[in-house]
Amino acid sequence: MLTVWERPKRWSGYTLGVDTAEGLGHGDYSCVQVIDVKEGKQVAIWHGRIPPDELAYEVYNIGVWYGNALCCVESNNHGLTTIVQLRQLGYPNMFRKRSLNNESNKMTQEFGWKTTRTSKPLMIDDLGMALKNEELILHCRDTIGELRTFTRNERGSMSGSPYDDRVMALAMANQMRKYAFIPEFVQKVDDTFTFDWWRRQIPSNDPENNHIGTNSFRGTA
């Protein structure tokens, strides 16, 4: 289910943090957090149980609605399925990490955020600092509730009880604020070769009045 506190603004930049799950009726939840880069506002959240490939469509529509927001999907486990589907849909602004392969001496890239023993503490510590310094404005009570139960044990393992999907998605969205930018101009979309160009001509000039899914490009030839 999608909850929106603030609709997209033309001159604002946004980030998406995506925590994925298997999508079973009795399992963990998937979550998408949307943050305003400049103001640190939590502007929207999607939360529910859905297969990872279908989650990609939700992420795509939310991301496009928020001006092609910088999207970061956790690449562990089921997240790879979501990433592959997003790439097939042609989402234009996915986070990717570039690194130099010492053996081939070539640059390689990996889409998404891989949560490891090293990267998870970094991400959570950055989130903690942002909250402590009041850089983030949260509206979701359930997100705040998960933050209150999120702990680190003696072995250094971090988790929430019973769930922490909202926290992890928020941490990724906050991490992306380092790499996102606030647009200096709004690029117009060429609708010439899309099957639904006529439906998108009017709202395309005013994204604040767009309804979610209006700018879906799944029909692009």
PLM ranges: what are they?
Residues 1-98, 105-109, 121, 125, ...:
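RNase H-like, metal-dependent nuclease domains and their acidic two-metal-ion catalytic environment used
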